[in-house]
Design a protein with these regions (language model features):
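N-terminal core-binding DNA-recognition domain of tyrosine recombinases/integrases
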Residues: 33-47, 56-120
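Basic/aromatic DNA-contact patch characteristic of tyrosine site-specific recombinases
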Residues: 1-61, 65
Length: 120
């Protein structure tokens, strides 16, 4: 599975212009785009939304490499999910900066909590 960020210069009023989709099918990744829409309604800037989309794109690529899907179910989340993502990022070469790793984890945490408020 391959994922990418698309940017729509004209989007419906309550939809973020930055969207994460599966590359081959164009199918949107629902949990990510719902979070981006929520942040868009909060009036975050387009550049900020695009950064969020790319950070979540990185997470969903990692998630799909393990779970073979971009969809996240609450039952798949564990207390160690974000720690495992942290370890994955720390093992990359070249290693991302500490602030990049922290930004990616923070946005993934917020998006997952938005979708699954009762998850571990």
């Amino acid at each position: 599975m391959k994922f990418r960020v698309i940017y729509q210069h004209t989007s419906p009023s309550a939809h973020s212009p930055a969207r994460v989709v599966e590359q081959n099918t164009g199918r949107e990744i629902g949990w990510i785009n719902r979070y981006l829409d929520r942040e868009y309604v909060r009036r975050l800037g387009d550049k900020t939304l695009r950064i969020y989309a790319y950070n979540l794109l990185h997470f969903v690529r990692w998630w799909a490499s393990i779970h073979h899907t971009g969809e996240v179910r609450e039952t798949d989340l564990t207390e160690s999910t974000l720690r495992e993502y942290l370890c994955f990022q720390s093992s990359l070469q070249p290693r991302p900066s500490g602030s990049t790793i922290n930004d990616r984890i923070a946005i993934a945490d917020r998006a997952l909590r938005n979708e699954f408020p009762d998850a571990p």
